[in-house]
Amino acid sequence: SNVGKPGDTDAQRQFIDAGIWRYHPTRKAFEIFARGLSNPWGFDFNDYGQGCATCCVIPHLFHVVQGGTYHKQARPHVNPYIYDDIKTIRDHTHLSAHGGARFYLADVFPAEYRDRLFMCNIHEHAVLTDVLEPKGSSFIGHHGDDFLPTNDLGWVGFSVCLLYTSDAADD
């Protein structure tokens, strides 16, 4: 696809066949953040500004840095001069089809959930967690617990949104 900000001509748009892009609504600026991946349906930043993406079909967890070129499902990369693409950081597998990604940064759940990456798994009908362990300049993603197994084939989680509210009456 040729992607750009609203109103751009085809000549102003950038080609992207897989990856993560972002648009700044007040500056009206479009940029490709990273290339590769396959259906990165979840992306979030942790407390330290490190981004992680969850993907569908291919290995599910990637530490994403701006400008990186990552493993993808099909076709050669747009840039023929890369030596190799950046691989997954996970050391385990879930069933395929992940959707959503959210680092838990609040303090309502027990302390062991802080900084975990929450994601939905469409085929498992569950909300799962991964625990990131620093390794060199990146991480290893370990399997956390299955936070919310639904045991309901009708429940297909796709997006993860964590809401924190405080009620002054509780104080």
Positions of predicted regions on the chain:
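Beta-propeller blade termini and top-face loops
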Residues: 1-166, 171
